Amino acid sequence: MSIKISFKKSISSKTFANLVLFVDEKFNAKLIKKYISNSEFSYVSDLLKTSDLNKKILVFNLNSKKKIVLVSIKKNIKNHDIENLGAELYSLINHGKNSQYFINTESVVNSNKSFIGHFLHGMKLKSYDFTKYKTKKEKRSIDIYIIGKKNNISAKDQLKFKALEEGTFYARDLV
């Protein structure tokens, strides 16, 4: 299973198949109102009233082709916790049929400038799969589109994350 990450400044709202939004730790629905339609907002708000708000990630199936994923962010979250959130999201989307997800960075309520970088790094680390000796190799790929203006990951951070991922994957191959 591989992840392909693409950065976009904006995309037509009609193309959103599966949308990932970030909310505060209390799952305040008012923060996501401007990113989804009114009917979707009322549906998600109703479901939030009956959901277990102690979870970090909630997934709402709007219909057979569209999901909204809400990721809860604590106020003083550390970098390794952000990476764990990304890994948890990957675990949820890995077993589904859908292969396209749109992460809206405008909904990030955290002041950490490298939040998206650490979040994606956690997803990439979780996506590792040792397939060297498997006879049937799975060719499925998950496309992650990062949309919004808060998606600026510096070139230095991208190189750092890539080096960490390659080193980690190499060490896992040796073990």
Where are these regions (language model features)?
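Short amphipathic alpha-helical segment within the helicase RecA-like ATPase core
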Residues: 1-175
